[in-house]
Amino acid sequence: MLAARNIHLVADSTRVKGAVPESGSEPFTLILSEDSFDSYKIDPPSNELTITKDQLVELYSEMVKMRRMEVAADQAYKNKLVRGFCHLAIGQEAVAVGMEQAIKPDDSLITAYRCHTFVVQRGGTISGMLAELFGREGGLSKGKGGSMHVYTPNFFGGNGIVGAQVPLGTGLAFAQKYLKTNHATFTLYGDGASNQGQV
């Protein structure tokens, strides 16, 4: 007999500490469910978040923009306007938007495919990303990188080889330490890459 998986949605258990102010710029505190973070041999982050209504609207607006870009890319791909692969991240917009809010502009980020939203959040433009998908010279990699091989000054690309971004990210982090910068490198990978030898 198969064991049933218990699924718990923590977003619906988020609550406000005190009252929500009328002003959009006045901060208030959200209390996240204690189940929001699982940790192993490390302290989890605080489950309290101080934010304003204006900031929440801005985050939501960015997520909607990222979704609309990915939907446009999907339509273009289905209409055969995009050559090669087109790896979308529809439904994962909050990851790119949330990370960009948490890290510094000079921090480095590297990932695998499904990187369009990270490219835009790290300084690329939606028009540049779409031009890249269409193979245009105005694309972020001059139309030669396609869906995966796109770069901005602190985004070191999606990577076409599953898990290959991990050793590259390690090298970026080592360079930051060697140069004594006050920056971090974030290397992102998914379930499939977690079983690769270099990870």
Q: What do the PLM-derived regions correspond to, one by one?
A:
Residues 2-114:
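N-terminal amphipathic, basic-rich helices that act as targeting or association modules
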Residues 71-75, 79-199:
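Cofactor-binding active-site loop characterized by glycine-rich and histidine/acidic residues
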